[in-house]
Amino acid sequence: MKSILEQLSSMTVVVADTGDLDSIKKFQPRDATTNPSLILAAAKNPDYVKLIDKAIESSENTLPNGFSEIELIKETVDQVSVFFGKEILKIISGRVSTEVDARLSFDTEATVKKARKLINLYKNFGIEKERILIKIAATWEGIKAAEILEKEGIKCNLTLLFNFCQAVTCANANITLISPFVGRILDWHKAKTGKTSFIGAEDPGVISVTQIYKYFKEKGFKTEVMGASFRNLDEIKELAGCDLLTIAPKFLEELKREKGVLIRKLDASTKINNSIDYKFEEKDFRLSMLEDQMASEKLSEGITGFSKAIEELEELLIERLSEMKNHKLISAN
């Protein structure tokens, strides 16, 4: 009998949610997603010290003469993300998602500028933009930035997405892909209700993604739906049939080991017959987020968490740069 992972792969594009190259080699997904936390975790792995060093050296060669250490570190953060993305693309056949600095989440212009830079860094390695998804937090400013980028042919993945309003606003902006979070929605409801278990289709994260998926298919939106942030296998199984699911290696391993019959839960032909065409202007979007305590809190928490991960990555790079300088001094003596 086929494994659950094999069956899932026949109805959904399985994506690896990791920056760990060995895990990606092991599971051979079509696509892969990264975020600041995953890049930080990979950067801490001693196996990838050489990759970090190459990113630092590349940054030194990229910057004009007279650059400061701060400028070098900021440049290296971008290059580290691209270096990992480049190595991932050697393994997979599809796309890699590379995230814009989360600290720019409320700045449309800066987000557009950073995304263009990341695409150019990939281009310098001979990697075309068609293989890259630029990840941007689904704030109003982030969605507007993605709308601009999409018109330039730069495909985007809108992340930290927690409600229907965010999803529909992305679809109306013709964004390539959205990543509605499942597990973080579950976390919030557990904390607020005191209920320790939400089974299968009762899981609030599953309910959210199912609603978004069905509405998109009914309205004919081209925006792909990629469920993300899972806490257990049941959540993944309940979304079998979704366009894509990005799954952490530990769950990929469990799905690979498990046998049994996987039932398709989502299908493009399954519709909810909702005749309303939802459109959210900026004031509507902001009010919707304000009224949705879960989405508002989780979006804020996600941006804060990813921002802290970038700051920690910057500290790690400062330490590594110091080690490299000391090594050069010792070698010179």
Swiss-Prot record:
It comes from the Bacteria. It catalyses: D-sedoheptulose 7-phosphate + D-glyceraldehyde 3-phosphate = D-erythrose 4-phosphate + beta-D-fructose 6-phosphate. PROSITE patterns: TRANSALDOLASE_1, TRANSALDOLASE_2. One of its GO terms (molecular function) is transaldolase activity. It is an enzyme of class 2 (transferase). GO terms for cellular component: cytoplasm. Its EC number is 2.2.1.2. The keyword Cytoplasm applies. Keywords: Cytoplasm, Pentose shunt, Schiff base, Transferase. CDD domains: Transaldolase_TalAB (cd00957). GO terms for biological process: carbohydrate metabolic process; pentose-phosphate shunt. It holds the Pfam family TAL_FSA. InterPro entries: Aldolase_TIM, TAL/FSA, Transaldolase_1, Transaldolase_AS. It is found in: Cytoplasm. Pathway: Carbohydrate degradation; pentose phosphate pathway; D-glyceraldehyde 3-phosphate and beta-D-fructose 6-phosphate from D-ribose 5-phosphate and D-xylulose 5-phosphate (non-oxidative stage): step 2/3. The active site is at 135 (schiff-base intermediate with substrate). PANTHER family: TRANSALDOLASE. Belongs to the transaldolase family. Type 1 subfamily. Homodimer. Transaldolase is important for the balance of metabolites in the pentose-phosphate pathway. This is Transaldolase. The lineage of its organism: Bacteria, Bacillati, Cyanobacteriota, Cyanophyceae, Synechococcales.
